[in-house]
A protein has these predicted regions:
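Conserved HGGG/HGGXW glycine-rich cap/lid loop of the alpha/beta-hydrolase fold
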Residues: 1-53
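Flexible "cap/lid" loop of the alpha/beta hydrolase fold
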Residues: 105-146
């Protein structure tokens, strides 16, 4: 928990991606606490400070939904903003629709999705813009259900550099350089071997037709070069009654890292607006 919440403001809970990506990158949003609201982040079960492995039966949406509910109860939080990035946004959508919990001032759906099928389709569309060699390596790996080849690894790395994030260097923020205990098992059994082949427990995730059940205002944020393509983001925007969409030009899957100033400004203005300030 970073900072304290001033009277008239609500804290913000951050849900990281993956599953299994850890909270580390969210430390880039510590500065949000300077405006007088606590920023709450945690490592979901299966990674970081909550690392567990050898229990593939755990890696279901229900596990992480129950964990989020337990966190909110434990901290006695009765009003808050909820930000989910990538998989974390999927978890936020599940929470908002299945729990219909009171006290959520707003939700921020950052580079996320309402349908695994649409997500996979869009990733495959973008793969077609890659070199023929990379396309062939990915297609062969998927056809054989074998993602162990060096050619596939290189192709997947190229894809992620294009649409997820750049390489971490000595000049990157410390929270990105810091060694993390990623949840490889949680990712594999929860999502799949990569971003475009959902084979895990989230493979049939689809809340597109239920987005209208979300009763809180939602800010959709994504990048033009994002894994969360404009079509994926627009599907969220179109389906949620009270929604706004901010598109970061030139950003990949983590606009809060690549365009931190703009991201924090948009985020803070949104939360203040929803608190009636």
């Amino acid at each position: 928990i970073v900072g304290k919440t001033e009277e008239g403001k609500s804290p913000i809970i951050l849900l990281h991606g993956g599953p299994g990506s850890t909270h580390n990158y969210f430390e880039l949003l510590d500065r949000v606490a300077e405006s007088g609201r606590a920023v709450i982040m945690y490592d979901q079960l299966g990674c970081g400070n909550s690392f567990v492995e050898g229990h593939p039966e755990l890696w279901t949406p229900e596990t992480w939904l129950n964990e989020l509910c337990a966190l909110i109860d434990y901290l006695h939080i009765d009003h808050f903003h909820l930000l989910g990035q990538s998989w974390g946004g999927m978890l936020a959508i599940i929470y908002l629709i299945e729990k219909q919990a009171k006290g959520v001032k707003s939700a921020i759906l950052s580079s996320t999705l309402s349908s695994s099928k649409l997500w996979a389709s869009e990733q495959h569309r973008m793969i077609k813009f890659m070199s023929e060699e990379d396309q062939r390596s990915i297609a062969e790996a998927e056809a054989k259900d074998d993602f162990s080849s060096e050619a596939y690894a290189k192709a997947n790395e190229h894809f992620m550099l294009l649409h997820c994030a750049g390489e971490v260097t000595k000049d990157s923020p410390e929270c990105l350089r810091r060694k993390k205990r990623a949840g490889a098992e949680a990712y594999l059994y929860g999502w799949g071997p990569n971003e475009y082949t959902p084979t895990g427990t989230l493979r049939d995730y689809d809340y597109t037709d239920r987005l209208g059940e979300i009763q809180v205002p939602c800010l959709v944020m994504s990048g033009t070069n994002d894994l969360c393509t404009p079509l994926v983001a627009k599907t969220l925007y179109d389906g949620i009654q009270d929604s706004k969409w901010h598109l970061f030009v030139g950003a990949r899957h983590m606009p809060f890292a690549e365009q931190n100033d703009e991201y924090c400004k948009v985020l803070e203005e949104w939360m203040e607006e929803k608190e009636g300030k």
